[in-house]
Amino acid sequence: MWANEEDRPFWKKAAKASREYLKKACHKDTGLAAEYAYYDGTPYEKEQDVFGGRHDWYYSDSYRVIANIGLDYEWFAADEWNVENNNKVQKFFCETHKDEEFKIYEIDGTVIEQPALHPVAMIATNAQASLAANGPYCLLYTSDAADE
């Protein structure tokens, strides 16, 4: 870790705990995560009228979860789960919703019939997911991101 030497044991423990949390927060089939979730990984479904609406969807702020999983693997390669998860994310978008406009999704992949507000961010997220992916789609989004 790149922290002060006296803080490294704490940050190493925090990184390990964060990786374990993500295994709970990311959906077992799609790899998607909600914007907000409880400590047990369950999507936060309350207060849907606060902070602009629902936060139990794969939407906006949750894109960075997938991006950060890619970055964590690129820097540390500490857990092969990162690769498994990001392969699921890319498979979801490339097989389940191939050639469709990006929408808002529940983390199980259910489509919310509203357009994604940040489609370029979704392309960039899927490209960054490739840092921790080895599936058949890992190069597709990197070229898509370069085209944007």
Predicted regions and their residues:
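Conserved small/polar residues in nucleotide/adenosyl-binding loops
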Residues: 141-148
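Extended ligand-binding clefts on enzyme/binding-domain cores
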Residues: 1-138
